[in-house]
Amino acid sequence: MPKTDWNFSKQGYIDVPGGRIWYGVVSGGNAGATPLLAIHGGPGMSHDYLYPLVDLADERPIVFYDQLDAGLSDRPNDPANWRIERFLSEIDVVREYLDLKTLSIFGNSWGGTLAAAYTSSHPKGIEKLILSSPLLNTDRWITDNRFYRESLPIDVQKVMVDCEVAGQTNSQAYEDAVDVFYRRHFCRSDPWPGYVTDTFEALNNKCYAGMWGPNEFTCTGVLRGYDGTAALSSIEVPTLMTFGEHDEAAPASCREYALAIPSVSCA
């Protein structure tokens, strides 16, 4: 179970194509309000790092779930499951199982990929959408993060290049260098909060590598070449696009994506 005290009012497992996925609901008493479905990033990460959303539970139920091959869910690690369409189908199953006829959706990073794609194609019953530093175009993401990489200390960049040339991207030296990047552009708190370390400890590297790649600035997996921007104009619900100054989803890119959404605010 998660190390952070979540105080779930309800949790369990749901059968989906490929296995079982875990879900948990946090509710502060306002059960009649429109629930918020939280979709985590990765791929292969867990719901843990989304813990700050619990602060909203006094206003509405917050529904968390771990995608297949992530967190507390089953991990068949079958590449046949690593398709966007299958992950979108999980949202339908969660909605049906928990009777979420009306809801709002929050998606972060890869979760934003799913949230945007789902809302544009399954708008019925969705009141509002929050896209938090979303991955919407892989090539743009790689370009932005390679720019960030070039801003790292020269010695850190040299370790990365030397390890990549030598085929030693699994080495401790390379992991330490990438950690410098993550501490600038994934989470800048020092030390990292427990709910962030919980997520990294639960990371399914097989799923992450198979769908994305070895790190945030190299994509060799299923999402290589992905572009979901064409669907943004089909999002009909009020949308909030959030991003931070140092986010891997660079502010300039997020502002550009927002221009395509008919009813959007940025924060």
Task: Give the positions of each predicted feature.
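Hydrophobic, aromatic-rich cap/lid helix
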Residues: G194-G228
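Conserved hydrolase catalytic core segment
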Residues: K101-F147
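Active-site loop/oxyanion-hole signature of alpha/beta-hydrolase fold enzymes
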Residues: V63-W110
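Short beta-strand/loop motif that positions the catalytic acidic residue
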Residues: I235, M241-F243
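Conserved alpha/beta-hydrolase "acid-adjacent" motif
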Residues: E248-S253
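Helix-rich cap/lid subdomain of alpha/beta-hydrolase
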Residues: D139-N204
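Conserved HGGG/HGGXW glycine-rich cap/lid loop of the alpha/beta-hydrolase fold
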Residues: P17-P76, A80
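N-terminal cap/lid segment of alpha/beta-hydrolase-fold proteins
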Residues: P2-R20
